[in-house]
Amino acid sequence: MASKFKQVILDLTVEKDKKDKKGGKASKQSEEEPHHLEEVENKKPGGNVRRKVRRLVPNFLWAIPNRHVDRNEGGEDVGRFVVQGTEVKRKTTEQQVRPYRRFRTPEPDNHYDFCLIP
C-alpha cells in the first residue's frame, strides 16, 4: 500500500510540474493532496477508538410466555407469571453483565496473615 501512495504522490508531482511548465497555476487542492496522503500514511489504525458503554435491555416482555392471557382470570397462575417475569429479568440482566463481572472467589481463612495490602 505504501508503494501505491508513493506512486500517487509521484503522479501528482509530475502533473504539477507539467502545469508549471505550461504557465498555468496548479490548483490548491492538488498541492494539498500529497501532504494529506503523507499524513494518512503515517497514521496508525485504531488510534482514536472509544469504548462504548453497554446498556441493558429495558423491555423484557418478549421473554415472558403467554403474555396475551387475561390478567383478571387465573388466580394462582397470575402469581406464577409475575415470579416467572422477575426471573426472566434477573437472568437476562445477569447474562448481559456476565462478561464484565470478575470471578468472585471467597478469601481463605489465613488471607489476612499473608495479605500485603493494608
UniProtKB/Swiss-Prot annotation:
It holds the Pfam family BEX. Residues 14-50 are annotated as: Disordered. Transmembrane segments: none annotated. Keywords: Cytoplasm, Cytoskeleton, Metal-binding, Nucleus, Ubl conjugation, Zinc. Residues 30-88 are annotated as: Interaction with SIRT2. One of its GO terms (biological process) is negative regulation of tubulin deacetylation. GO terms for cellular component: cytoplasm; microtubule; nucleus; spindle pole. Induction: Up-regulated by cadmium in testis (at protein level). Up-regulated by curcumin. Ubiquitinated and degraded by the proteasome. Residues 28-44 have a biased composition (Basic and acidic residues). It comes from the Eukaryota. Belongs to the BEX family. May play a role in microtubule deacetylation by negatively regulating the SIRT2 deacetylase activity toward alpha-tubulin and thereby participate in the control of cell cycle progression and genomic stability. In absence of reductive stress, acts as a pseudosubstrate for the CRL2(FEM1B) complex: associates with FEM1B via zinc, thereby preventing association between FEM1B and its substrates. This is Protein BEX4.
